[in-house]
Amino acid sequence: MSGRFAEISKDGATGARRKRSHSCAAAIVGALLCIGSEPQIAQASVQFSPQLEGAIQRASERYSMPQSTLRAFAAIESGGNSRAKTGSYYGVYQLSHGEFRKYGGHGNIFDPKVNTDVAARKLRSESDAFSLQYGRAPTATELYMIHQQGVGGAAMHMANPDWPAWLNMYLTDEGRQKGPGWARLAIWGNVPADQRAQFPGGVDGITSRQFMDMWAKKMARFGGSARDAYAGAVVDGVQ
């Protein structure tokens, strides 16, 4: 099942979509994600096809992305199902056609080899952009927030973790264009059904900190425990 609400547009710059302790910067200028100590979480077991495993290994080597992160994204987005379709998102990594083209995709978006390669290139690009902005590589969860909520949404969540999550989404450029209803659905549509009971107030009762922490735990369940994405990617022979 995809972790992304089906109708969120993520093609624009602001488009929506473990055990290690670390301190979080207090200054808003840092706008760093503060999830706190990562708890030990029971691992979920997901079996991928040999074809997808091979694609993940090749993409990891080509783009210097941790295999653990790529596997976790695939598990959360589609369970490894290459035929998955959620609204306007397709394949193992639930890419839109716009994303697919932007990051060099050709041929069949449902092809797990192609879908994985494009997704890894996209995540590498987003990881590098994060590093330039914040002076460090992103955690797997931070990278997933960018993938799911968009660059603008992720930045707002990190800068204002104790604000209502939907309000942070509404204050992005895309949120202002599409309105509060869209922003609320961008959050509540990404709260799994089995997690909603802990938020009796509904979407109004979930802060960005709670939203990010919920996804950090899910990421950890699927093995996305690498502290940082790898640096120094080599793309098409150029570092």
Listing of model-derived features with the role each one plays in the protein:
Residues 2-58, 82, 98-106:
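N-terminal export signals and maturation junctions of secreted/periplasmic proteins
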Residues 29-80, 113-134, 222, 227-233, ...:
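Export/targeting segments at the very N-terminus of extracytoplasmic proteins
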Residues 65-68, 90, 138-140:
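Extracytoplasmic
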Residues 78-85, 126-130, 149-160:
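Secretory-pathway/luminal and periplasmic proteins that interact with or process carbohydrate-rich
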Residues 141-208:
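Catalytic and substrate-binding regions of cell-wall glycan-acting enzymes that process beta-1,4-linked
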Residues 192-239:
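Low-complexity, Gly/Ser/Thr/Pro-rich intrinsically disordered linker/tail segments
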